[in-house]
Amino acid sequence: MAARIFLLYLFLLCCACHVQAQQDTDTARHATGVKKTLRNIYIEGNKRTRRNIILREMSVSEGDKLPVAKMDELAELNRKRIFNLPLFTEVVIDILPVDDTTVDWLVKVGEQWFIIPELTLKLADRNINTWVKEQNADIRRANLGVAFKHRNFRGNLETLSAIVQIGYTQKLGLEYFKPYIDKKQQHGIGASFFFSQNEETFFNTSGNKWQFVKKPGLYIIRHFEAATKYVHRPGYANRHTVEARYRSFRADDTIVKLNRDYYKDGSNRLQIMEFTYRYDLNKVDNWNYPTTGLKVVGTAGFRVGLQGFGFQSYVNGEVGYFKRFGRKWLWSEILRGRLTAPDDMPYTFRYAMGNGSEYVRGYEYYVIDGTQYALLRTNLKYELVNTAIRNFPIRYLAVIPIRIYPKIFADVGYAVNPLAGTSFLNNRGLAGYGFGVDIVSAYDFKLRLEYTWNHLGQKGLFLHTNSE
């Protein structure tokens, strides 16, 4: 097990080194030819965002000598870099000639609405299809929340958010993150606190379906966590995150009687400290919806029990490769995997595919627990629409981008579970394929409509609002 974890992590690091070497080669290539001096970088439209936050994202600085042959390409590269900040609805860079040897750049930005009070209605189930088919669209399984989020607190890209949620899951939360605490803008810190409780929860998996238990008027599961993190961002695309998290769980005796391994050995209380290190290499063109580039994410962590738990280590990995063919065709491969040790762990940590964004498309109705899993997604897309509605009569939504991508896709996956029981989709290969359409718009909005077949001969139309 340790060897597999080491090899996976070594693979991710090798990918990162390869991309960094390629970046150095590209930089050297740009250094040839006739050059002009970048005299000034002017910025317009940043009524809230500080100038240094924008300059931090750029690959050029005032005084740099830029190759004339690459000037437009560099301007577009930096426009995309600035747009990847979750702050702007539009970014434009104009090149202003000064004389034969000098140019200025004018960066024009349209700021988003940073203070976002949200009234949210979220489903407690894993996806909309599960809620409709298995829970008969029971509105009692919805969560009504009021969230206050400031995405550019004090103009420094700081985030401050608070949430109060009622309904199926009652939740209170507070989170703060300051991306830069130093003059070089490389080091950041953050902290968060969350509490939740439910009258109903799943206590086991049988036949790759969650089994639920409920006690009306009694909260049978409670969860509290507090976390702090440190982030080091030495360059534009590289990010290192170290996090320490305290987590406390309490379950009603009813859950323990139904599943003694829920927290392990019949315990109804679980307290742990969790420590993680995460490395991100993000060399894609658009962080919200990539179409070209490479993305590598590696996470290594361990959990130490303070009560009702021993020790668990894990490694998660993701490699995404995105390629554009011609002007309209897009191809992507996304590989994800997870390894944990030991195999004998509480049920609540024995998750693999079927929750969140980790699933083989076509198996959205199933939960596939496991201690290890691998998932590969392949997509071929066509850029049918790439336009924007301009001069919209709302200040913070003056430009509404609209992109539509018809696609075909195929997924394969495998989850290892030594305690599979009656679940029949574990410890075997899974495959799904289909066609669909992605719709992307402002404020990181994404909508995926997918019609999928799986190896069981089942088919259906699925709706998702998260990324692939």
Regions found by a protein language model. Give the residues of each.
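Outer-membrane beta-barrel channels and translocator barrels
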Residues: 88, 112-114, 153-155, 181-184, ...
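C-terminal outer-membrane beta-barrel translocator/porin domains of Gram-negative envelope proteins
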Residues: 272-399
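Outer-membrane beta-barrel initiation region
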Residues: 34-192, 266-290, 372, 415-420, ...
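Outer-membrane beta-barrel "beta-signal"
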Residues: 276, 380, 439, 458-468
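Outer-membrane beta-barrel translocator/channel fold
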Residues: 193-234, 337-371, 458-463
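Outer-membrane beta-barrel pore domains and translocons
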Residues: 120-124, 147-151, 163-167, 177-179, ...
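Transmembrane beta-strand segments of outer-membrane beta-barrel domains in Gram-negative
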Residues: 186-330, 411, 415-418, 426
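Residues that define the transmembrane beta-barrel architecture of outer-membrane proteins
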Residues: 140-144, 168-172, 220-226, 269-275, ...
